[in-house]
Amino acid sequence: MPNRALITGASRGLGLALARALAADGWELVVDARGEHDLRAATADLGPAAAVHAVPGDVADEAHRLDLAAAVDALGGGLDLLVHNASRLGPSPQPSIAMYPLEELERVYAANVFGPLRLTQLLLPCMGPDARIVSITSDAAVEPYEGWGGYGSSKAALEQWTRVLAAERPDLCVYVVDPGDMRTQMHQDAFPGEDISDRPLPEASVPGLLTVIEGDLPGGRYEARTVVPAELATGVAP
């Protein structure tokens, strides 16, 4: 039976790049994104229909989270990997924290903190020993960048509950991974009107993510572009 992963936010950017890499390695995938058309178009070339299960919806929505859990349960055999990649930036341009609309902040936290936590709660029963959970974070979670109070604080909260989960569930492999700046639509939205063509494509962060997913690294926080290659992490020669 192939390994099975659930990746949120897989219609573009890092989520899609990771989905492509895992599909190429023979993983069975359950993927989601807010836009149904974009999700199905993006995942059409990932592999046989039986190996890629697209479930469109918003991770901030409880009904959608239940749909994702039901999709995994219907496949049988449990879940080997859960990647919390979907996220919401918030207003663009990003407001100062003193002027941040609380209703917008609630939406950011619903997508970046509460949604992933609730999805984890729903999926833990089908994750066996050594299953992996990866929460995608940002340097804005640890650095006080002006204008990043909403998104950054939500990623800090995501990191903290992920690390607490790692302490509470030592039978699982739980990671926080910062992919670094990437040439994505979200990054462009964070810097409206600026040229971001010097940022690496999301694919540049995938090898490091695969090291975390397929290697033997201890749980913790990693930067995707600075982790060692997977064959070195596992001690297997290339």
Model-identified regions with their sequence ranges:
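Conserved glycine-rich cofactor-binding loop
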Residues: 11-12
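Conserved glycine-rich Rossmann-like NAD(P)H-binding loop of the short-chain dehydrogenase/reductase
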Residues: 25-42
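The beta1-alpha1 cofactor-binding region of Rossmann-like NAD(H)/NADP(H)-dependent oxidoreductases
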Residues: 56-68
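Active-site Tyr-X3-Lys motif and surrounding loop/helix of classical short-chain dehydrogenase/reductase
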Residues: 67-71, 93-99, 103-110
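Hydrophobic positions on the long internal alpha-helix
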Residues: 83, 116-123, 127, 161-162
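Catalytic loop of short-chain dehydrogenase/reductase
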Residues: 88-89, 96-102, 117, 130-157, ...
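C-terminal helical subdomain
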Residues: 172, 176-179, 184, 192-236
